[in-house]
């Protein structure tokens, strides 16, 4: 079955087998006329077809179990697929095994999946009395609607789908949630069931293992266990509290970045957190981003709490006159921003309402774009390398709706391409995916569980310099408009630390660990030596804790291990008398002894090993 053809691919579109036969693109066994075959396997294109059909299998099973069920949409998404529906019956996660069993029953029937094309009038008649399907049709232009059938079940859908339910053997329903109709909180709440499907048993097994591993590594769970951060309902949703250990971790990253930024010619700046609405009107945020902002009124003047740092940095630029000799100007700020996120999308540190960006804005001439972007790419590589992340880049080009001259866009886009080429970086192109004011590069990192995360962005902006009438004096003594490059490598400290926590499972590398060394005196007489050693380590900028509670030695060691501290030193008579330390080293997965002076030199060297 693994070699069976299930669809073809042409012009960036998946075409299922039935449609491909009609179009002369397949004979049912092989792809024809220059199309790419899609076989039944765990490749991305095949999984899209498999998961789409599994969503229909889910809907068919729900209809059999709950005859009054009505269905909205059931798309393929990054985490598998889902279906939104409603029923008068109460459904909980405890019902998922029952629904899954019914899906397996239908799959074993080996039902042919066929397609029918209806006019709008016919489709409205076919789904008469089904307000959810009518809602789907109202969002679709044109007069042709696909209806897919398997057994007695049929559903409005554009496809693509498998030719038969017999292919669906390896799937799992993963969770149940609520979802507003069409994502609009003013509409009724529907039930959403998520699932995953693969062509192979191994694919499903590996995925479920990763899910279990992800649960263990969940940053919200680790945040509590390791004392990194918390949330408080009395303060408000999406507003994290950084606890001492989490703040230490964050400060270490901030300090490493600051040192590197200064060496790379960036200047620290600081803008206010509230700015008059007048400047948000000039920037365009007031018209285009207002629903994501918070506002307040002071002395009858409206102010907006900043959702981004760019306007403040523009005002720093405007605080003085500039010539071409001053450029490029690189401003950075760990800028606290606030964005009005709906409560349903808030998720630990990954999606919050207050966060701090590692933000920088570069003001340069057009000719300097490539060299500046090249320097950012070099900086990005060093940061990702330090944290053991693999990463990929995606270049987004000019969208249909955009501002600026074609030649200017082409020149800016080519500058980004040349910078990527200079660093021999393979990159994807998102045609038309750029902002209306300039091309961009997105930085996507891959964690230890092979999940991809959007973090940093390098954005060329030809809009805000125009809106704010920015200028510098060029070599001909004429006023010229600079280009503005928005640049965040981590994205936000909150999001990056969430990803970092899950990537390492809380086992942070020594150079950023919130507690780097645990000192465990065996009894009271060893406590003085532990305190002296603590002071010596603190002078070397090491985060160290003395575990001196009246517990057994084994219990104190287990506590240090549970806190995922990289180095544990047990201090007894021998260590105090000889000053030869007994070290449990998590990173080396070894226990060894080392003279005190040598140990202090070693940890000092470890702190100097990492730089961006």
Curated annotation (Swiss-Prot):
Its EC number is 6.1.1.3. It holds the Pfam family tRNA_SAD. It is found in: Cytoplasm. The gene is thrS. Binds 1 zinc ion per subunit. Residues 218-509 are annotated as: Catalytic. This is Threonine--tRNA ligase. CDD domains: ThrRS_anticodon, ThrRS_core. Zn(2+) binds at residues 310, 361, 486. It comes from Helicobacter pylori (strain Shi470).
